[in-house]
């Protein structure tokens, strides 16, 4: 590793060289706080009975995948340095007046040293609204990171930023190439655990998504990764209670955009009664009501994305679909699918016509012209936030700002009602 690649990084003792020790700040690996021991890197409280190597030496089990932290060793931080400022924005598109208002507000918030929340509907163009504030920071020689909880979203975002920004960009996730220092970093939120006071601007996209939401370890990671005088921007289509509280306390500024970039309303889900979905699928059959809905949709020749709650159900349903629709190309994807990215791209290009997915594709991916069905939308896994995100896959393209969006179930849950209510309220706020 080059010395400059360690700037802004949080390193364990085993990662240190003599050259690095000369410029590093020593930090306690495990601190004692009010009689309890706490990991400096991830903030976890240490179980003194179980998390120990000997009677005298404790370690942190919570973040051990990043390298073991021991109470008898130190952590080391190498101070971040400014970059050489540069013009770097290649994007030739234009923002709508609504998007421009948010973009300008974010630039002013950063100049004023404020943190901000962008609460914008799915398909509002949140990424494009970030371009100017990112470009402004990098032009001033600042270090910027865009972090998101999901690898799929991270990789798709990296591809877009590579196309629209000319500066070097590093991509960081569990399966990525080794890190090298760049003015712009695209990373999963877990990768923030490897940084310390590294970024002048930290943008956390999909802040409501698992595994970031309600995860104190990842909150600590974000807190450590930002410089003391740095700014954090949060992006979401479904805000969290914690962020709403911060807005009320005026700890962060809120910018809301209830209108999609193409100016059309959000597609509101329809609820369709389909009894015994799971029972029939597990027997190798597709419920009659569901079969008729799929047949009707396939006559349109638009791609069909079907969400399921569990991997086993998705696998069985995909096999059932192949039997009933032998002329269609049907594929199932989940977190366990090794070539998921290729399949997603083939679905986008219509080489795959019907895609069955777990909630791994609930957010961060765009499929023009797509229709969406949610099987067992009354399943406990389908929370309001998840259903709003899934609904946001429909109607995202200017060429087809509408689409078929069905919640298929044999009951209506509070989460389903709340999701539909929120979508209708956003449309109302946008003037529809």
Please report, for each region that a protein language model flagged, where it lies by residue.
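Conserved interdomain linker/interface between the two RecA-like ATPase lobes of SF2 helicase motors
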Residues: 251-314, 318, 330
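Interdomain "pre-motor" coupling segment immediately N-terminal to P-loop NTPase/helicase cores
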Residues: 28-82
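Conserved segment of the helicase C-terminal RecA-like domain
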Residues: 228-242, 391-422
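Walker A/P-loop
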Residues: 111-133
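Conserved helicase motor
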Residues: 148-156, 160, 170-180, 187-194, ...
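Conserved RecA-like helicase motor core of SF1/SF2 enzymes
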Residues: 206-209, 344, 348-401, 409-414
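N-terminal pre-P-loop "Q-motif" helix
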Residues: 91-114
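Post-DEXD/H (motif II) to motif III coupling segment of the RecA-like Helicase ATP-binding lobe
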Residues: 199-273
């Amino acid at each position: 590793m080059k010395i400059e690649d360690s700037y802004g990084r949080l390193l364990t003792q085993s990662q240190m060289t003599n050259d690095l020790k000369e410029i590093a700040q020593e930090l306690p690996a495990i601190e004692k706080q009010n009689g309890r021991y706490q990991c400096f890197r991830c903030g976890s409280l240490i179980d003194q009975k179980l998390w120990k190597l000997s009677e005298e030496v404790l370690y942190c089990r919570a973040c051990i995948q990043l390298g073991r932290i021991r109470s008898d060793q130190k952590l080391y931080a190498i101070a971040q340095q400014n970059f050489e400022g540069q013009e770097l924005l290649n994007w030739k598109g234009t923002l709508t007046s609504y998007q421009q208002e948010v973009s300008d507000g974010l630039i002013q918030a950063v100049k004023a040293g404020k943190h901000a929340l962008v609460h914008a509907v799915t398909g509002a163009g949140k990424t494009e609204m970030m371009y100017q504030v990112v470009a402004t920071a990098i032009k001033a020689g600042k270090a910027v990171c865009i972090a998101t909880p999901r690898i799929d979203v991270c990789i798709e975002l990296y591809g877009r930023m590579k196309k629209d920004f000319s500066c070097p960009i590093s991509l960081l996730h569990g399966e990525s190439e080794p890190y090298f220092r760049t003015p712009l970093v695209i990373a999963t939120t877990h990768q923030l655990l490897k940084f310390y006071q590294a970024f002048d601007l930290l943008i956390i996209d999909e802040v409501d998504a698992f595994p970031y939401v309600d995860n104190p370890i990842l909150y600590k990671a974000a807190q450590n990764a930002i410089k003391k005088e740095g700014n954090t921007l949060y992006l979401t289509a479904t805000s969290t209670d914690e962020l709403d509280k911060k807005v009320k306390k005026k700890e962060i500024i809120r910018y809301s955009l209830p209108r999609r970039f193409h100016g059309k309303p959000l597609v509101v889900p329809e609820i369709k009664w389909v009894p015994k979905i799971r029972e029939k699928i597990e027997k190798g059959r597709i419920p009659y009501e569901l079969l008729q809905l799929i047949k009707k949709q396939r006559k349109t020749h638009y791609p069909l994305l079907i969400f399921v709650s569990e991997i086993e159900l998705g696998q069985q349903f995909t096999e059932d679909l192949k039997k009933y629709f032998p002329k269609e190309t049907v594929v199932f994807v989940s977190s366990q699918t090794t070539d998921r990215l290729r399949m997603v791209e083939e679905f986008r290009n219509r080489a795959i016509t019907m895609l069955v997915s777990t909630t791994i594709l609930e957010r961060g991916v765009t499929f023009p012209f797509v229709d969406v069905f949610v099987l067992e939308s009354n399943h406990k896994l389908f929370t309001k936030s998840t259903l709003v995100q899934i609904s946001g896959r429909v109607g995202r393209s200017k060429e087809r700002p509408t689409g078929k969006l069905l919640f298929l179930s044999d009951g209506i849950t509070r989460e389903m009602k709340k999701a539909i209510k929120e979508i209708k309220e956003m449309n109302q706020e946008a003037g529809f």
